[in-house]
């Protein structure tokens, strides 16, 4: 009697990074099959949902801070609007992630059925973590709303591959944004610089989580106490400091991760220890990231076809 055929193994690859550097173009340039014949299925950004369903979220996200700076909105009003906008950016990703996670087996098995490769334009971490952190560092998003946002990050099933693309060359980044000329987009150099730094730090954060969770909570808490307070003086250092590649088998210093920006007196006791609820939230963030396989991909000077063939 013939044994029942196993379903094909699903390989998930998320392509993420700052906006305007050409992720969608890279996906378009990718073939539909691997050299071995495995199909490559592509899932693009839900741009129609973002821009055509009621409010144009891209325009609103850029206009709201300007309205606050112009006095048309209070800080509280601006924070609430930005939180709502970021939540709506995240909604399609969370919905699809929930559906996809139900199809992912916890264990990768060898089978005679060709693998299916699913290439996705962005992971939920973009709308829930990276863009809110960037807005927070720019003074456009409150710490309270940021904490509320990261609670929504879903637990990741094993087998997630995250490729973070960055473009440190600001001139090239600005040129790419201007050349596509999308309504409502702005080539704000400060935001682009901050967003690239946040994404580079995301890679360090995932690598830290890979070697810390789920068994090193006490060690993490001791490292936390040694972090300096994240005052305004550390902001420029966070954005501009070099980030040399560290071997993935080496434990990443905590101060290279995104968690360092949460060392704020609003979240801690006088001795720097996290208050219990925030400790749960940040440790929960690490446990949600620790199963992700991550790599950093600097696409400076590369064409989209060159990127797609690597």
UniProtKB/Swiss-Prot annotation:
Reactions it catalyzes: thymidine + ATP = dTMP + ADP + H(+)
Xref: Pfam families: Herpes_TK
Enzyme Commission number, as recorded: 2.7.1.21
This protein's record includes keyword Kinase: yes
Keywords: ATP-binding, DNA synthesis, Early protein, Kinase, Nucleotide-binding, Transferase
UniProt binding sites for ATP: 17-24, 176
Gene Ontology MF, one: ATP binding
Binding site for substrate: 86, 182
Heme listed as a keyword: no
Biological-process GO terms, alphabetical: DNA biosynthetic process; TMP biosynthetic process
Active site residues per record: 45
Family the UniProt entry places it in: Belongs to the herpesviridae thymidine kinase family.
Assembly mode: Homodimer.
Biological role: Catalyzes the transfer of the gamma-phospho group of ATP to thymidine to generate dTMP in the salvage pathway of pyrimidine synthesis. The dTMP serves as a substrate for DNA polymerase during viral DNA replication. Allows the virus to be reactivated and to grow in non-proliferative cells lacking a high concentration of phosphorylated nucleic acid precursors.
Protein name (database record): Thymidine kinase
Species of the source: Meleagrid herpesvirus 1 (strain FC126)
């Amino acid at each position: 009697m013939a044994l029942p055929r196993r379903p094909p193994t699903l390989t998930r690859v998320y392509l993420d990074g700052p906006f305007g550097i050409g992720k969608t173009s890279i996906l378009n340039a990718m073939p539909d099959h691997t050299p071995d014949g495995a199909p490559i299925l592509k899932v693009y950004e839900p741009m129609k949902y973002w821009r055509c369903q009621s409010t144009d979220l891209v325009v609103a996200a850029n206009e709201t801070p300007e309205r606050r700076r112009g006095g048309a909105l209070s800080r509280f009003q601006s924070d609430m609007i930005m939180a709502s906008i970021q939540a709506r950016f995240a909604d399609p990703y969370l919905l699809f992630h929930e559906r996809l996670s139900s199809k992912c087996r916890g264990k990768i098995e060898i089978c005679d059925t060709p693998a299916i490769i699913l290439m996705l334009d962005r992971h939920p971490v973009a709308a829930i973590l990276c863009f809110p952190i960037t807005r927070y560092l720019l003074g456009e998003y409150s710490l309270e709303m940021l904490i509320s946002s990261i609670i929504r990050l879903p637990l990741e099933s094993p087998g997630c591959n995250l490729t973070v693309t960055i473009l440190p060359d600001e001139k090239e980044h600005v040129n790419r944004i201007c050349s596509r000329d999308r309504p409502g987009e702005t080539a704000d150099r400060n935001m682009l610089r901050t967003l690239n730094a946040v994404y580079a730090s995301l890679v360090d954060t995932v690598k830290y989580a890979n070697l810390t969770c789920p068994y090193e909570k006490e060690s993490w808490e001791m490292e936390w106490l040694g972090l300096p307070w994240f005052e305004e003086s550390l902001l420029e250092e966070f954005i501009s400091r070099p980030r040399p590649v560290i071997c993935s088998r080496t434990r990443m210093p905590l101060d290279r991760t995104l968690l360092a920006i949460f060392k704020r007196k609003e979240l801690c006791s006088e001795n720097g220890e996290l208050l219990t609820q925030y400790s749960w939230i940040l440790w929960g963030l690490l446990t949600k990231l620790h199963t992700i396989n991550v790599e950093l991909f600097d696409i400076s000077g590369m064409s989209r076809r060159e990127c797609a063939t690597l």
